[in-house]
Amino acid sequence: MKHSNKPYDSFQDELEDYIKVQKARGLEPKTCFRRMRGEYLESCGYREEFDSRPRYRMFDQRLPSGTNHSYPRSCSSSQTEDRVPQWLPAHDKIRLNSLSYCQFTRDGFSEKPVPLNLSQQEYNCGSYSVESVVHKRLCSEHSTIDPQVSHRQMHQKRKKHVEEGREKQEERPKHERKRSSEEMDLNKHRSIQRKKTKAETETVQDGTEKLKNRKEKKTRDVSSKKEDRKRRKEKKEQGEERTEEEMLWDQSILGF
């Protein structure tokens, strides 16, 4: 059945429109809502719970279908109107109050969950419809993907990973060669420093030894000169101590 989205100023206008449509279809609509409502309110009270959550979720539809609905007794129509959310339009509030009349009577006699009208179903299903549209769009996009395209993409990704792995393997030897060359340069520099230090040490040692040898040689030369002088002096003294016989002998033989 198609529901009209035409806004009504009152419930009476909506009811008259509904009766016309039913009569045009050859049906006899039930118009005993007010009498049934009065009888039901006399027998028991009803208190309608409104949900103030967003997206116009007016009723809790998560109850099992077989559960019996019982309502508190002390509730008036003014209290019900006071609990209507302020963010609903005026014509929606009117339709909500009129809907509560029908639902009160139906619940009182049948004790079954009351089906919601089109506007309330739209309010309750607002968030779910958005989620379902997004889910369907994602599923359709996933289903429209060509298997060959997806296989090609997977192959390209795999090839890219392999190439990245090769590049990393090529970069490792470069780093290793660079590190080994740096280590070689460092070792070479250290060896040069060791050789230089050793040469300097040897030079110092050679200089010290040479200086020592010079001192020793000089000391030996001085001592030898002293000994020569001493010998000459001794010889001279011995020559002066010759006897007269030796001097005469020298004169007679040598002629001096």
UniProtKB/Swiss-Prot annotation:
Alphabetic keyword roster: Coiled coil
Record field: compositional bias (Polar residues): 64-79
Domain of life from the UniProt record: Eukaryota
Keyword Coiled coil applies: yes
Keyword Cell wall biogenesis/degradation: no
Biased composition (Basic and acidic residues): 161-188, 218-227
Ranges in a coiled coil: 209-247
Region (Disordered): 62-84, 144-256
PANTHER family: LYSINE-RICH COILED-COIL PROTEIN 1
Protein name: Lysine-rich coiled-coil protein 1
Gene: Krcc1
